[in-house]
């Protein structure tokens, strides 16, 4: 059995450190995707309240105030913010993949939520954030996000997990129809790295789609220089602008929609032909990103 499914990948700047504004933004984008006929919309990693880029700034004096604000503007699974987003998904009859910072007690986690068109939610925490991410986020136990839906089997992983053979291999063997590769966007301190992380992430997404033989949505955040109020702190030189590299890929790893400019905000939209009744064995996963 095959079905045509319109999907949307978000490329947008988060509402930094403002959970209320972030929820309003997510609901607005859900409504915009629905109005374009999408049945699934995917958001970047930790889109609420934004990825904590100050980790790259090597500014220890920022950590106290910003970290406290980050915790305060993270969401709880049973809180009113996620309930509002779930209600929007149900009202619009759309599936939503959302990366967010989950607050539990005095810790925060890099979490992925999959909300179906009835508003039912499944949440999974990133088990092993990168070394730098662990300066903010906790580690967790439990499986990655994988769920049967009316659109087929949907799975989600965050960011650097796509470079780990163990993390992606288990997902691929499950026979995903649609994979959500939730990237945070890409901007670094100038001179800190010669690696083009945006190119690496796109290569990793293509590799994953080919190995899993699944469709892949790769939402990313736009991170302008004003992100984290860097300019106000006299540090306007530390962040690059732009950084959005949202993609929608076919099982062959090729683009199904023309990518937006790196600093452009909006929705990338494409139609997928999903064969939900046919099992597609995954190919072996590698921990190297290949174009």
For each of these PLM feature ranges, what is it?
Residues 4-14, 111, 123, 152-161, ...:
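Active-site-proximal beta-strand elements of phosphoester/diester hydrolases
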Residues 19, 31-117, 186-203, 207-214:
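Cys-nucleophile CN-hydrolase/nitrilase-fold catalytic domain and related Cys-dependent amidase chemistry
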Residues 98-100, 110-114, 145, 246-248, ...:
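Short beta-strand scaffold segments in enzyme catalytic cores
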Residues 125-140, 263-283:
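A short, polar/charged loop-to-alpha-helix boundary motif
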Residues 128-147, 160-166:
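Active-site glycine-rich loop that binds ribose-phosphate moieties when present
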Residues 146-177, 181, 277-291:
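Cysteine/selenocysteine-centered motifs that mediate thiol-based redox chemistry or coordinate metal-sulfur cofactors
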């Amino acid at each position: 059995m095959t079905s045509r499914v319109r999907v949307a990948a978000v490329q947008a700047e988060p509402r930094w450190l403002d959970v209320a504004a972030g929820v309003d933004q997510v609901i607005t984008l859900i409504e915009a995707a629905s109005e374009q006929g999408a049945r699934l919309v995917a958001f970047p990693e930790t889109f609420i309240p934004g990825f904590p880029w100050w980790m790259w700034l090597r500014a220890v004096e920022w950590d106290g105030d910003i970290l406290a604000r980050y915790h305060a503007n993270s969401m709880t699974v049973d809180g009113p913010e996620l309930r509002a987003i779930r209600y929007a998904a149900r009202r619009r009859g759309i599936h939503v993949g959302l990366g967010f910072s989950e607050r539990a007690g005095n810790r925060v986690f890099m979490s992925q939520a999959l909300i179906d068109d009835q508003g039912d939610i499944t949440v999974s925490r990133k088990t092993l954030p990168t070394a730098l991410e662990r300066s903010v986020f906790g580690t967790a136990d439990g499986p990655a996000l994988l769920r049967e839906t009316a659109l087929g089997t949907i799975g989600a992983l965050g960011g650097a997990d796509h470079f780990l053979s163990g993390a992606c291999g288990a997902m691929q063997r499950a026979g995903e129809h649609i994979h959500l590769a939730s990237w945070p966007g890409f901007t670094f301190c100038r001179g800190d790295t010669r690696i083009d992380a945006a190119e690496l992430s796109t290569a990793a997404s293509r590799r994953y789609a080919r190995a899993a033989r699944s469709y892949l949505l790769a939402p990313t955040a736009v991170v302008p220089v004003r992100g984290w109020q860097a300019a106000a702190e006299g540090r306007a030189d530390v962040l690059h602008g732009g950084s959005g590299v949202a993609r929608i890929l076919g099982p062959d790893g090729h683009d199904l929609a023309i990518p937006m400019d790196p600093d452009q905000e909006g929705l990338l939209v494409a139609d997928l032909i999903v064969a939900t009744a046919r099992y597609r064995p995954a190919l072996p996963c590698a921990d190297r990103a290949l174009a």
